[in-house]
């Protein structure tokens, strides 16, 4: 039942939109939603998780790289005083044709982002519940203080009347003492009520980040509710939309996918590689021209390459089998969360 409470509270808040009290409550919640650091952190974590989907997808897309080199060589003694300037540039393209681990990593990140999104929704529900609770605690504290103050005035009048009657000899001193004790008690109750109100206001400030000089009271006369559905129908609807159960199911799916990812460690990979490059080398020095063995000619070359890269893991010391077992144990643990 505790898991269903945030959803029921959220449904209740959505039904108050036509009431002036609900408008104020919704305004308070909107301020809490914008200023609450825990919810902002949860939103940032959710956005980061969805951004990681792009990172997980990137290895499946073409990888293009540009490289360039420059080398200057100054020769002396055995190098016959030959100087050289060499420049080269290359463009490399790599495209994954088959690599199941990369596809699996993308699926895992999508599921992880889904879990983070549910976590954010859960934090939203928690904030709704906390805001509504703090809001109504303030209203309740105001009512208690008002009642205590009214009670204090009534008891004070009773004390005044009893004192006057004692002065004319109509009652005993014990009646005055009893009335005084009641008045002292209600004074203490008033102090307690004021402290409770201050605490309730401070609790609301901690949630929303603002102090509110006035909060709208409940409009009981205009309060209307729809005809309630059968309890079983409400329970089924709440269980269907329960975020804790949804998060547990997504965690189970994630654990199941991690088993497949571990099993993919036995599969081969195939990549397409292509490159084009040019190089230019020039020589200078006193002996660049001379005997046949010491003649150096400038060169300018270009080269294109296309190839396939295939890899098949055969044995990795039992690591893959261990990873599969570990993932299976994690799946059992995630499944137990649904029980």
Residue ranges of model-derived segments:
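Transmembrane beta-barrel architecture of outer-membrane proteins
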Residues: 27, 86-88, 133, 178, ...
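Sec-dependent N-terminal signal peptides
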Residues: 4-12
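Periplasmic alpha-helical coiled-coil/stalk elements that build and connect Gram-negative outer-membrane
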Residues: 3, 126-241
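Bacterial Sec-pathway N-terminal export signals of envelope proteins
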Residues: 8, 20-69, 104, 211-256, ...
């Amino acid at each position: 039942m505790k898991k269903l409470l945030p959803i029921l509270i959220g449904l209740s808040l959505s039904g108050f939109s036509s009431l002036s009290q609900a408008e104020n409550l919704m305004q308070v919640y909107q301020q809490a939603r914008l200023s609450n650091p825990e919810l902002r952190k949860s939103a940032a974590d959710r956005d980061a998780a969805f951004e990681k989907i792009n990172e997980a997808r990137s290895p499946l897309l073409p990888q293009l790289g540009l490289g360039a080199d420059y080398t200057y060589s100054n020769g002396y003694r055995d190098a016959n005083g030959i100087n050289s300037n060499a420049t080269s540039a290359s463009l490399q393209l790599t495209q994954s044709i088959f690599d199941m681990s990369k596809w699996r990593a993308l699926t895992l990140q999508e599921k992880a982002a889904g879990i983070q999104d549910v976590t954010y929704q859960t934090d939203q529900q928690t904030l709704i519940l906390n805001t509504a609770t703090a809001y109504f605690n303030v209203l309740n504290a105001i009512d208690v203080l008002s009642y205590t103050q009214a009670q204090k005035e009534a008891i004070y009048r009773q004390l005044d009347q009893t004192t006057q009657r004692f002065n004319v000899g109509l009652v005993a001193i014990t009646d005055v003492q009893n009335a005084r004790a009641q008045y002292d008690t209600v004074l203490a109750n008033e102090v307690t009520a004021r402290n409770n109100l201050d605490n309730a206001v401070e609790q609301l400030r901690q949630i929303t980040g603002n102090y509110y000089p006035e909060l709208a009271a409940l409009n009981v006369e205009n309060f209307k509710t729809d005809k309630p559905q059968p309890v079983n129908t409400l329970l089924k609807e709440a269980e269907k939309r329960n975020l804790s159960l949804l998060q547990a199911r997504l965690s189970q799916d994630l654990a199941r996918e991690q088993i497949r990812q571990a099993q993919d460690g036995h599969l081969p990979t195939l990549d397409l590689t292509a490159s084009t490059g040019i190089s230019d080398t020039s020589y200078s020095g006193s002996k660049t021209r001379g005997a046949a063995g010491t003649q150096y000619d400038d060169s300018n070359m270009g080269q294109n390459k296309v190839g396939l890269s295939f890899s098949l893991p055969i044995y990795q010391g039992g690591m893959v089998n261990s990873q599969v077992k570990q993932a299976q144990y994690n799946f059992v643990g995630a499944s137990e969360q649904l029980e």
